[in-house]
Amino acid sequence: SPIFLRWHYFPKLLPWLIKFMANATESRSKKIIENLAPLVQDSVDQHKSLVKGTSAEKWLRDSKFSYIYKTHEAFKADAYGWKVKSEYGFIPNLVLGNDVRDEEPILSPDVRCMAVLEGQGYITNPLGYVTALFDVFQKNGGKFIKKSVKNLNTVNDHIYSVQLEDEEIICQKAVVTSGIWSKNLIKNLKIKVPLETERGYHIVYENPSMEP
């Protein structure tokens, strides 16, 4: 993917980039993949199980997942990536030449190779999906508290409470999902994770004339 960088931010980003590049070796990549795979390998099935019979289920769609290449040679040049994917069960069906347009009419005629993974899925409206999940969470007894978290209190490196601005919530486990702002919260846990900001994006087309 293309990278757009504000150059005045580069000095601040450099320590993270150095660590990132240090992990860009085959041995380190394999180790990272081994740890990530159990989290994401069955994510489609996990989503289906989570929302089955709830109002969030309507936002899920079964689908294929396709990697697009202009030529078969370009696909072959990506052999290492596919070797790793196949080791974890992601083995593609190749569609070549004019058959690509038959499979996906929305693609440009100069796309001559497509690697297709079966049994995938997508969410038609991320906002609608998480809103429905939030509603299910509350209906099942979940409690929503909107307050500033000041600290994660620990004993022997284990969390025992979440310190809010005006109260303390006793807990055995806590999930920290505040991205780059997690740094200060996890200090007490003696967890050192190199974190940096990344501007993300998501586009939803309303009533598109064509779909994959």
Tell me the role of every PLM-derived stretch.
Residues 91, 143, 192:
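Residue-level detector of anion-binding/catalytic polar loops
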Residues 60-62, 145-146, 195-198:
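A short coil-to-beta-strand element that immediately follows conserved catalytic motifs
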Residues 94-104, 122, 143-160:
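A conserved short coil-to-beta-strand element within the FAD-binding core of flavoproteins
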Residues 130-131, 135-136, 142-154, 173, ...:
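Loop-centered beta-sheet repeat module
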Residues 119, 211-212:
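Conserved FAD-binding catalytic core of PHBH/FMO-like flavoproteins
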Residues 11-135:
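Rossmann-like flavin
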Residues 153-154, 160-211:
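Central helical "cap/lid" subdomain
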Residues 1-4:
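N-terminal glycine-rich dinucleotide-binding loop that anchors FAD/FMN and/or NAD(P) in oxidoreductases
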